[in-house]
Amino acid sequence: MAQPFEDWYKNLPIVTKIYMTGCVVTSVSVYLGLVGPLRLYLNFPLVFGKYEFWRLFTNFFFYDEIGMNFFFHMYFLVRHSRLLEESSFRGRSADYLFMWIFGSFLLLIMDAFLFYTKIVTKVLFLAPSIAFMVIYVWSRRNPNMHISFLGLFTFSAPYLPWVILIMGYLFNHDLTTDLLGAVAGHAYYFLEDAYPLISNRRLLKTPGFLKNLMDGQEQPIVDAHQQQEVQQAQQQEVQQPVQNFLNEDDLDQQ
């Protein structure tokens, strides 16, 4: 039993592996009482008034205490993050890490704006937002993939974020964190994919130190035939029903 999990974990791409590990360690620490959620959540008065700067970082690593809701979030996130990192970011782990950093900064800026303008004051953890950003970018990068919903109907991948939002609305969940993630994901998609086609200029450039940091960590770039095989394998995977992801627990916002 341990060996298959060890092999699965070992084969995870580097950025997905690091983030998943950080989330698991954080939630286990909370479960064991080593740290409380009150020490992790995002609180701007404490950040800037009490200099508790770690909150800008830790709020991205806590979804929930160990339980079904946590495992649903982890499975959904790791699945799509791995698909994204192994396909359009294959051989470009530094670029993928930069996407996460860009999204995190943008989410912090948006959350600070909402907090200080008193539009929304209860976004305590941005982990669901960063996960939704990953799902959004994956969906836009895979327009030809199809997803089966409960075996009743299928839709193309770009509609996945909106299906999740609609389900959240039907279950009367707060959609703030998901909407923030959608904005961050679309901002990255526009600046990285759409804007260069319009202007022939690229605004987002991965810093050299990140490339040096990730040197040797990237998965090898595959040729066109191998890339097609990877995409076909991923197509088969995303054809699986998504009922495990679109239920009430999975859409629960922290």
UniProtKB/Swiss-Prot annotation:
One of its GO terms (cellular component) is endoplasmic reticulum membrane. Residues 39-95, 140-146 are lumenal. The chain crosses the membrane at residues 18-38, 96-116, 119-139, 147-167. It is a multi-pass membrane protein. It comes from the Eukaryota. It is found in: Endoplasmic reticulum membrane. Keywords: Endoplasmic reticulum, Membrane, Transmembrane, Transmembrane helix, Unfolded protein response. Its main location: endoplasmic reticulum. Residues 1-17, 117-118, 168-254 are cytoplasmic. GO terms for biological process: endoplasmic reticulum unfolded protein response; ERAD pathway; regulation of retrograde protein transport, ER to cytosol. Pfam families: DER1. GO terms for molecular function: signal recognition particle binding. Belongs to the derlin family. May be involved in the degradation process of specific misfolded endoplasmic reticulum (ER) luminal proteins. May also be involved in endoplasmic reticulum stress-induced pre-emptive quality control, a mechanism that selectively attenuates the translocation of newly synthesized proteins into the endoplasmic reticulum and reroutes them to the cytosol for proteasomal degradation. This is Probable derlin-2 homolog. It comes from Dictyostelium discoideum. The gene is derl2.
